[in-house]
Amino acid sequence: MPLLKILQESLKLLYREPKIFVPRLITTALYTAVIIYIAGITSQIAEATGYFQGDAASIDPAVVRALLGDLVIVLVSLLFLLLLDLISYAMYPALIREHSAGRPISLHGSLKEALGAWKILAVLGVMIILFALAGSIFILPFQFIALKTGEVSFYLFAAFIVMVAALVLLILLFFVIPVGVIEKKGVLDAFRHGFALSFRHKKDLFAINLFFLILSTVTFALMVLAETQYQGLAALSSIILFILVRVIQAVIYTYICVVNPYFYIQVR
C-alpha cells in the first residue's frame, strides 16, 4: 500500500474509532500536570538565582537547597511518565490489529498485551534515556558558546545534529514495538526483525518519520508559545490556548501511534 494511502487510512481510523484517543489523552493530561509543576519550580529557581533581576550571581543557597526536593519529584515523575508513555504507545499495535481484523477493539486487552512486552519497553526506555543524556551533553557546550557570544547559530547547529540522530534512531526502532506486541517476539527477535524491516522500507520510513518530526516540532513550538506568551490580563487567553495546544498534541501523537502499527500490518 502506498505511503500516502497508509497516512490517509490511519487518519480515517481515528474518526471511526474515537476510543483510540483515550491512552494518549491520559498521558497528555499527566504530562500537562507535570509541566505546570516544572514551570512553577523553574520560576522559583529563577527568582532564587536573581535571574529576573539580571543578577545571576546573587544566589540564595538556602532557597536552592529547598528546591532540590522538588527537582527530585520532577525527575521521578518524568521517569514514570516515560514508562507510561511507552506502555500507552505499545497498546496501539493490538488496537490496530483487532480493528484491521474486523474485531471490536478493547483498551483493557491492548493494555494487557502492552504489559506483556515489558522487556522490550524496558530496553527502549533505557535507550531513550541514554539518547536524551547524550544529546543534552552534546548540546551543552554549544549552548554555552551561544550564550557567551550571542550567536544562536551554534545552538541551532547542535540541535540540528541531535535531530538528525533522533531521526535515524526513530527509523531503526520504528517496527520494534509492533513486532514485539503483534508477533509476540522476545527482545532480541523483536529488535532483529524490526531492524530488518526498517532497512527494507528505509525510504518510506525516512519520509514518514521526517513528517512526524516536523509535526512534533511544530506542536512543541505551539506548546512553548502557549506557556510563555500570555500573562496578566490575558490569563484567560493563556488558559484557552494552553488547553487547545494540549488537545492538538494528543491528536497528533495519537495519529503517530496509529500509523506505526498500521504501516507494519501492511508490510509484514
For the regions a language model picked out, list residue spans one by one:
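Short, small/hydrophobic-residue-rich motifs at membrane-helix boundaries and re-entrant hairpins
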Residues: L4-Q8, Y15, K19-A101, A132, ...
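Residue-level signature of the transmembrane alpha-helical core
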Residues: L25, A29, L79, L95, ...
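Short membrane-interface loop/juxtamembrane segments of multi-pass integral membrane proteins
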Residues: A62-A66, E113-A114, G194-H201
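Selective recognition of hydrophobic, aromatic-rich stretches within alpha-helical transmembrane segments
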Residues: G69-A101, Q143-A146, G150-L188, S237-R268
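Nonpolar helix-loop interface/hinge motif
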Residues: M1-Q44, P104-H108, M163-A235
